[in-house]
């Protein structure tokens, strides 16, 4: 059979068949031989209808004369393959006529690098809530996006993605079908409200385009958020790291792994881990030619300097100056994302520029980036300004989103030690005694920031 066009078939039970003859279910793959594949494709093209034996033979064997036994052997082989993966009785024999594929199947194209269209895959959301089926939300979101009929945007059906629930199966899908974008998400309960946290990712180099969190019953807003960010990337390609060279895909993936390792060290929030994070970020910005990654490294290095100052490992004024010098590297960039704005809000806030900090934080919120970090930065600035209740609210929100980030846990413990003074005197606030030397150092250094001469950004 002539297989000129790239395509794939998707079955409701999570099976996927590609034109190379690979049948996939989750992490399992089975190869279908060429003749059997030809027979199967003829049946799939007429799924639900009877296909005459002579028509199958003519389509697969073309001008070669073969007996019915050759077709019978192919049908038997196909049935054995499907039965092995638990998908039996899908090929029916219609007495004295032919065969029929009785399962429901969807046919999709495989996105080619040279096409002007763009495609998106929505992977299954994860949740620990027993009262919610995330696949229902996935299906609704797929339907909403596809029903909007955005010119040039192809949405993969749930039949293609509903078994892509881990990194192995997702990476397999990405490498075989090559969508332009994909969406991942998780559902958590936040103050008794079921909230969907999503990330829109450029599939070519695994770079985060945008993230957001919305109540699960606001899927129309979620779909519009996804579409808007895709359209901005398509119509303003300078926003997208897809401009990175195609042959650097593996290198970019490796650099992204290094970035994640550096962030993990920073999140651990010990002096030793922060020094390790600085080494990683400095090495990354020196060897990467991706401007967005270099910019993020500068901003994270700025946060590292301020974090070391809070631990008493460097002078606060010197740390603030170094942080601001690093931000000078990104000040000329015309398009900045929420991560950059949020870190700039932190540095300016801890440098005494409250109004500038507030504006930057508000802009970061609009650009919808790492919300947990945004709340963490705002908590530090509120703590610095002795707005303890506001700091407590922000750090609690940060921990609700990312409970495993130790830096937020430490600041939460510090904030909880800082309480109103019950005595009627000029000292409105004081902090309780603590056995933790590191906590005392952090609190003391946050208070010392108030004594610094205001440092202005150049």
UniProtKB/Swiss-Prot annotation:
Any one Gene Ontology cellular component term annotated for this protein: cytosol
Keywords tagged on the record: DNA-binding, TPR repeat, Transcription, Transcription regulation
GO biological process: one example: phosphorelay signal transduction system
Position of the signal peptide: none
Matching SUPFAM superfamilies: C-terminal effector domain of the bipartite response regulators, TPR-like
Alphabetical list of Pfam families matching this protein: Trans_reg_C
Keyword Transcription: yes
A GO molecular-function descriptor: DNA binding
NCBIfam families reported for this sequence: PRK11906.1
TPR repeat boundaries on the chain: 372-405
CDD domains: trans_reg_C (cd00383)
Protein's name according to its UniProt entry: Uncharacterized protein YgeH
Start-end of DNA-binding region: 4-103
Domain of life: Bacteria
UniProt KW Transcription keyword: yes
């Amino acid at each position: 059979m002539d297989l000129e066009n790239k395509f794939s078939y998707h079955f409701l039970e999570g099976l996927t068949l590609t034109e190379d003859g690979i049948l996939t279910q989750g992490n399992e793959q089975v190869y279908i031989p060429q003749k059997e594949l030809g027979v199967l494709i003829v049946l799939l093209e007429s799924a639900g209808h009877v296909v005459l034996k002579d028509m199958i033979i003519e389509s697969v064997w073309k001008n070669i004369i073969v007996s019915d036994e050759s077709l019978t052997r192919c049908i038997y082989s196909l049935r054995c393959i499907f039965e092995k993966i638990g998908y039996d009785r899908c090929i029916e024999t219609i007495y004295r006529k032919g065969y029929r594929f009785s399962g429901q199947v969807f046919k999709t194209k495989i996105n080619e690098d040279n096409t002007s269209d763009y495609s998106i895959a929505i992977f299954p959301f994860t949740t620990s809530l027993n009262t919610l089926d995330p696949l229902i939300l996935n299906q609704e979101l797929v339907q909403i996006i596809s029903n909007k009929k955005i010119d040039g945007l192809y949405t993969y059906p749930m039949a293609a993605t509903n078994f892509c629930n881990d990194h192995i199966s997702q990476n397999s899908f990405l490498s075989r079908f090559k969508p332009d974008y994909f969406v991942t998400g998780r559902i958590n309960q936040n103050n008794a409200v079921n909230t969907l946290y999503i990330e829109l990712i450029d599939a070519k180099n695994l770079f985060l385009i945008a993230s957001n969190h919305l109540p699960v019953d606001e899927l129309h807003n979620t779909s519009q958020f996804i579409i808007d960010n895709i359209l901005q990337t398509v119509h303003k390609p300078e926003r997208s790291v897809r401009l990175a060279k195609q042959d650097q895909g593996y290198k970019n993936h490796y650099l992204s792994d290094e970035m994640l390792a550096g962030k993990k060290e920073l999140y651990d929030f010990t002096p030793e881990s922060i020094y390790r994070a600085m080494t990683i970020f400095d090495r990354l910005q020196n060897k990467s030619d991706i401007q967005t990654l270099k910019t993020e490294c500068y901003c994270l290095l700025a946060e590292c300097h301020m974090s070391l100052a809070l631990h008493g490992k460097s002078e606060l004024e010197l740390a603030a100056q170094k942080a601001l010098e690093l931000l000078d590297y990104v000040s000329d960039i015309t398009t900045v994302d929420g991560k950059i704005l949020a870190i700039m809000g932190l540095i300016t806030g801890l440098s005494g520029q409250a109004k500038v900090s507030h504006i930057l934080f508000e802009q970061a919120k609009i650009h919808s980036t790492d919300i947990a970090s945004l709340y963490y930065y705002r908590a530090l600035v509120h703590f610095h300004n002795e707005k303890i209740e506001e700091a407590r609210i922000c750090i609690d929100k940060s921990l609700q989103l990312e409970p495993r980030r130790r830096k937020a846990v430490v600041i939460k413990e510090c904030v909880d030690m800082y309480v109103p003074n019950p005595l009627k005197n000029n000292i409105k606030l004081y902090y309780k005694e603590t056995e933790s030397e590191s906590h005392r150092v952090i609190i003391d250094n946050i208070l010392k920031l108030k004594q610094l001469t205001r440092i202005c950004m150049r």
